[in-house]
Amino acid sequence: MTHIRWLFSTNHKDIGTLYLIFGAWAGMVGTALSILIRAELSQPGTLLGDDQIFNVIVTAHAFVMIFFMVMPIMIGGFGNWLVPLMLGAPDMAFPRMNNMSFWLLPPSLLLLLASAGVEAGAGTGWTVYPPLAGNLAHTGASVDLTIFSLHLAGVSSILGAVNFITTIFNMKPPTMTQYQTPLFVWSVLITAVLLLLSLPVLAAAITMLLTDRNLNTSFFDPAGGGDPILYQHLFWFFGHPEVYILILPGFGIISHVVAYYAGKKEPFGYMGMVWAMMAIGLLGFIVWAHHMFTVGMDVDTRAYFTSATMIIAIPTGVKVFSWLATLHGGKIVWHTPMLWALGFIFLFTVGGLTGIVLSNSSLDIILHDTYYVVAHFHYVLSMGAVFAIMAGFVHWFPLFTGYTLNETWAKAHFIIMFAGVNLTFFPQHFLGLAGMPRRYSDYPDAYTTWNIISSIGSTVSLIAVMLFMFILWEAFSAKRKAIATDLLNTNLEWLHGCPPPYHTYEEPAFVQTNFKK
């Protein structure tokens, strides 16, 4: 019966667990690819042999980490597990569609890995720009397999988004208004709306690329009246909301973790937090061309995209200062999730500041496609999204499993990881300012020192990842039972114990909503 339970599951907790395991596995693959990248760049000269294989590894690293690690863990894992529990819903709105959303991902990952294994692989970068992604520069099936992989991952995400939106709107208790749902639920809702609106545009772009490659159309070929810049507009209209999709659930997680370990019953400025996330979601759709400052846009177009991009810093600042205000006056408990959350707040802010630098179109002309950009988005992803995932995972691990992690090991893991990621990515700001371009497998000797330091940092991060695997093994091996949790009134997910029973809220939940002052 076990294989039936896991293959045909319609239970949000089981599907959430599948997502978490799949995401962890993909995370290992993505980490391995990143170690190969840093090994190649650890000294001048070549290690892997040629630029194509290097670019295939870079492309696969990006796709695996985005579509098969961060999104499945944050939206599929945490979303499935927590949204029904926080709402008091018996399950997701469409349980079988939920199962399909998950099972589209392994074939998608298989297609992506297959694309690297046939012909010369897809060495296009994750943006898959034509003409490099066209059938002259990339003959063979590699790019086509990548496109099919993205189609499957996209369908999976769209179905998941529909499911979450329906669940959050329709499956609340009758007396609960939208403004009484927890911030994590809000973050998943806004993320789902972004997915629903942006992914079809990506699907259109890569389908046109597919027909350009195979059916002799010329959407992106100037010889037939097309324009490669059209592809960039379509891709980034998806690509920019996508980066907010990656971080928004993290915002929700951090709000919960900070409030919990500061001993507060709610985060500071609930409504401000909600509206800030909505503002970020909306603004995320009208800034896409800041990725294209170097393609030759009008000065007034550049001025608009610079200003609009800077505006996003305002709601982001609202969130950062609200987290700090939540800490204020609290009885702070220095458990591991709190360390991850504080690391998130600091490092995400650093990444945000370099984002403000890059939003200036005139500066971006110089910094575009240099390691400054790599440093920027790895600060918000490798230290934003990943730190949020770690904060949430360590915080809710007793809920998911009924066991507790070893606090000492978990703190050591945080310290090693913190050192590793900063050592890896901080020097890349210097490389970028010195003009080292991205996506090259070799570099002039002048860049050697910072690259060596960056590669040492990646090895430290690898040790941290391996230590985390050990910590997980230790927890399941020692089987320390989780006993009690604090603040049950405002943290509904813990209500049924650790772990909760297979079915929760089989009868509608009673929710007291008239909070007396």
Swiss-Prot record:
Entry protein name: Cytochrome c oxidase subunit 1
Residues that coordinate or bind heme a3: 376
Spans within the Mitochondrial matrix topological domain: 1-11, 87-94, 171-182, 262-269, 328-335, 401-406, 479-517
Originating species: Petromyzon marinus (Sea lamprey)
Function: Component of the cytochrome c oxidase, the last enzyme in the mitochondrial electron transport chain which drives oxidative phosphorylation. The respiratory chain contains 3 multisubunit complexes succinate dehydrogenase (complex II, CII), ubiquinol-cytochrome c oxidoreductase (cytochrome b-c1 complex, complex III, CIII) and cytochrome c oxidase (complex IV, CIV), that cooperate to transfer electrons derived from NADH and succinate to molecular oxygen, creating an electrochemical gradient over the inner membrane that drives transmembrane transport and the ATP synthase.
Binding site for O2: 244
Gene Ontology BP term (one): electron transport coupled proton transport
Topological domains, Mitochondrial intermembrane: 41-50, 118-140, 213-227, 287-298, 358-370, 434-446
Cofactor annotation comment: Binds 2 heme A groups non-covalently per subunit. Binds a copper B center.
Reaction(s) the record says it catalyses: 4 Fe(II)-[cytochrome c] + O2 + 8 H(+)(in) = 4 Fe(III)-[cytochrome c] + 2 H2O + 4 H(+)(out)
Domain of life of the native organism: Eukaryota
Pfam family, one: COX1
